[in-house]
Amino acid sequence: MKPLISVIVPVYNGQDYLENCIISIENQTYDNLEIIIINDGSTDRTGAICVKLKEKYDNIRVVTLEDEGVSTARNAGIDMAKGGFLTFVDADDRLRPKALEVLYDSILSTGCDVAGCRFQTFREEPEWQGQLLTLHRIKEPAVYKPVEYLKKEILKGNSRCWSKLYRRSVVGNIRFQKGLSIGEDMLFLMELLPYVKKIAETDYPGYGYYQNPKGAMNREFTPKYMDQITCWEIARDKAMAIDKSTESEITTILLMSIMLVAGKIALLSLPKRRQQRESVRICREKLKKELKVPGAYEGLSKGYRFKVRLFRTAPGLYLALYHFRKYR
């Protein structure tokens, strides 16, 4: 029998999509699975749906938390997991039927500690069902050493914890950082890198990512969006512990993150923008500090260079122009 895979599914108010997510996991061609659903203080019908799913499938376990955040929910799943392998699936997403089989075979054929696959986005259920009709040839995965993976995957945007399968022995005592609402995926991977020998990546699109209009990145700015800056500051320290040459590249990403946060603030109405003066001040001070890192500014595109210069010298004007351009 193949080893047990523990599938960890955190959910908060997921009544509209949790069942379809779980069905996609139960329909995997890899058949030795346990599914751990962490209901993180949902206030809708999610709890009742969890009970229904547990009664229907004998490989499901359910844990209830008190709205403690996705990091705590995932950590609870890791602590409970009995499998020799772990994977994470967000409750509004889906898996293709062969996803876990492809990831497991990638680990088996390469001797890697982690295997990842690509993802496809969808907005409506019919769109996802249509994508399932498209056949994809399964090719040999690319294999990276940790430093290569950092440079060629994580720093190029593949910083997600989902769409990956992990050996449980490698995860060990590594957990998701609590208190962050953005970027906890990337920091988990950064923590993991020193402990892995090799990582495999297949171009098989095994994961379906739901573009949720109510998702965190589509919500109005709150001070929690500053976590996007904090996580890249932490990531830089972790990356430089692995390879010091990454400083300028990550600082370039940090500069872009600061501008993305500033853009979120700019989308607010004028009265609400005025309430975020402290956040604007922090963004500007951090920007000025990071511009001193050699090579960071030069790594920006021309468009970002213009934005950075304007925000640095006239943040109020930048926010007003950005708002006008988006809403004219």
Mark where each language-model region is:
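A conserved acidic beta->alpha catalytic loop
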Residues: 24, 31, 39-48, 66
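Donor-binding/catalytic cores of nucleotide-activated saccharide
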Residues: 70, 91-200, 207-223
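Membrane-interface aromatic/basic loop that binds lipid-linked glycans or pyrophosphate carriers
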Residues: 267-328
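N-proximal low-complexity "stem/linker" segments adjacent to membrane-targeting elements
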Residues: 1-27
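Glycine-rich, basic loop-to-helix element that forms the pyrophosphate-binding segment
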Residues: 65-81, 102
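Acidic helix N-cap motif at the loop->helix transition within catalytic regions
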Residues: 16-19, 33, 44-53, 94, ...
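Catalytic core of nucleotide-sugar-dependent glycosyltransferases
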Residues: 197, 204-212, 218-245, 260-291
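Short aromatic/hydrophobic "clamp" motif used to bind/position activated sugar donors
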Residues: 86
